[in-house]
Amino acid sequence: MKKIIAGLFVFVAVLSTKANAQQKDIVDVAAGSPAHTTLVAAVKAAGLVETLKGKGPFTVFAPTNDAFGKLPAGTVETLLKPENKGMLTGILTYHVVAGKLDAKAVGAAIKAGGGKAELTTVAGGKLTASVENGKVKITDAKGNSAYVTAADLNASNGVIHVIDSVLLPK
């Protein structure tokens, strides 16, 4: 009987841990990643924390610290200044698509579009998803591309796909 109760306790503990892990929202998942400290700082500076903690669902193409490092010197520091909040907000919301598009859904959209899928960001901009050399490529309005390096980081209010470059609106 003690073994059954102990086994039941372990089972409930495992379920609780999985349930708590799934309760992390987009911001919490990004904040837990050492590769996304710049993104999290930018989200805070833009005042988007509460929005991205909202119900959603959202699909976020999340640039890494290295992606931000590819921008011209001083760009990140300039964007984080309070007087540039509008520009920063525009760039960050350009990385967010309404709805939860996991890798399977993105792949299906690319296939249905004959090799390309147009995604509309919450900022109203357009991104183009395609596949190149077996990797999903996201192209911004200026023709710059980012590749998805990790897909389907699930959150309670959406999904994150890690990308290797910052996307820029027109």
Per-range role (PLM):
Residues 5-7, 15, 19-170:
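Mature, structured domains of secreted/extracytosolic soluble proteins
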